[in-house]
Amino acid sequence: MYMEISSASDDSIAYVETDPSGRYGRFREVLGKGAMKTVYKAFDQVLGMEVAWNQVKLNEVFRSPEPLQRLYSEVHLLKNLNHESIIRYCTSWIDVNRRTFNFITELFTSGTLREYRRKYQKVDIRAIKSWARQILNGLAYLHGHDPPVIHRDLKCDNIFVNGHLGQVKIGDLGLAAILRGSQNAHSVIGTPEFMAPELYEEDYNELVDIYSFGMCVLEMLTGEYPYSECTNPAQIYKKVTSGKLPDSFHLIQHTEAQRFVGKCLETVSRRLPAKELLADPFLAATDERDLAPLFRLPQQLAIQNLAANGTVVEHLPSTTDPTRTTDMSITGKMNSEDHTIFLQVQILDGDGHMRNIQFPFNILSDTPLEVALEMVKELEITDWDPLEIAAMIENEISLLVPNWRANDSSIRHESFGHEDDEDNGDTEGRTRLFSSASSSHDSPVAVRENNDDSSNDVIPDMDDGNRSSNRLLNSSTYHYSPAIDDDQNQQQRRRVRLQQKMRSLVDTRTQVLHRSLMELINKRRGRGFDPNTNELQPQPSSTDFIRRC
């Protein structure tokens, strides 16, 4: 039962119909139309968001059993799939009076990937990589499903885009097949231009989707439909079964991209599965921002806004990772006596178990990203990205210390006062104490002293033989974004670090002045003053805190 709050307005758009619960209202606007179904724009009154209303006329479906089977297959699959690269299903029902079958899915603002690519002729190779990686992640999920799922009709017409987010998702699963055990599929079905050679032999497995994926990437790169030089399906069949690639394949100017597409279009015995293709160098980012999923930005902002109010994050299906199994909130508290900041993390799992973790945060030496990486490793957090956690921490610190964001280079923190990485010898590692209410022991977490990160280099240099070997946070912790260690990139990173250090000099001096002022105030108030030495005791750092413990 939903309570409707309405307001009088002449500009409001009336619903053509609503679902049985009254939650979803359909408009007349048609988003797309196929041979079997029509997709309308609709509105979800509970979440306050636009959705896609898929409608099928049952009279048309019942003319033959095949369309009915396709419809059932699509809805049944969507109800059981849950992945960020697969179109999200909401609900379905049959309208007996109108003789229609209806189901609600998420809305895509920019249509299909084919329409989107034809609309925007100039697309950077980094965008192609991002789209390809999202699609391949979706295929890896489908093929790794239990039992495995084959799409069988993957093409740019069946991939949908949210252009303002850089997000693509796989849809139209009406032709998908579920492989039971180790059996292969045995029906010829799909779109000829995207069908693998073995499909015509009626004996194939999930690798046919990899072939179709390669054709999708080919279309993304060239903007041309595969085998557009052919005038009929018979010509396409002859080329495909003889192993001849489309003419557009030879138009690819990017060498690595052409090699990658060729890998996807190999014969089935040499074709790699989705999980292995994800590790291909073509999809690896040379810059950590190359493949940054732009659609995650609204998620981070939403998390920050909720965490700022100390609210446990609710994972709405429209904004969060559907594979996530825990809720997390981070709140900060400042000690008014010594101005030490303590952060409290609450983690709620799917079984209702709550973990409370408290630890100090030193605004002069700690960075949100370092702390987030520690948390991910030591608390064994697998369903949260370190950057998301870092954004929550940064938001809390900024609320407690408003000027901190300006005096700190945000998540990409640079410390001024040490040499470059190549000049650094052995450095002392700091440790932080995470205390969890759900465990009987405290876990010390080591952090590297060197905060020297650049925008292109988040992996610490582990070649230094003098580096301490007892640090728990080793290089494997940082491998959430690839980097290239050639001489040119190393020189560029050194230049970036030097520039950032120079820019942070003024901010660093501001921090020093602020600290000196606070020490003077505390001294006059009689806080932190040692009468034996007639000196002011410094503000305790994370290391001092641990030693006292």
Swiss-Prot record:
The active site is at 172 (proton acceptor). Residues 25-283 form the Protein kinase domain. Residues 414-490, 525-549 are annotated as: Disordered. Residues 467-476 have a biased composition (Low complexity). Its EC number is 2.7.11.1. The modification Phosphoserine is found at residue 504. Residues 531-549 have a biased composition (Polar residues). ATP binds at residues 105-108, 155. One of its GO terms (molecular function) is protein serine kinase activity. Disruption phenotype: Plants display early flowering and altered expression of genes involved in the photoperiod flowering pathway, such as ELF4, TOC1, CO and FT. Keywords: ATP-binding, Kinase, Nucleotide-binding, Phosphoprotein, Serine/threonine-protein kinase, Transferase. Pfam families: Pkinase. One of its GO terms (biological process) is photoperiodism, flowering. It catalyses: L-seryl-[protein] + ATP = O-phospho-L-seryl-[protein] + ADP + H(+); L-threonyl-[protein] + ATP = O-phospho-L-threonyl-[protein] + ADP + H(+). It comes from the Eukaryota. InterPro entries: Kinase-like_dom_sf (IPR011009), Prot_kinase_dom (IPR000719), Ser/Thr_kinase_AS (IPR008271), WNK_Ser-Thr_kinase (IPR050588). It is an enzyme of class 2 (transferase). Residues 452-463 have a biased composition (Acidic residues). Interacts with AHK4. Belongs to the protein kinase superfamily. Ser/Thr protein kinase family. WNK subfamily. Regulates flowering time by modulating the photoperiod pathway. This is Probable serine/threonine-protein kinase WNK5. The gene is WNK5.
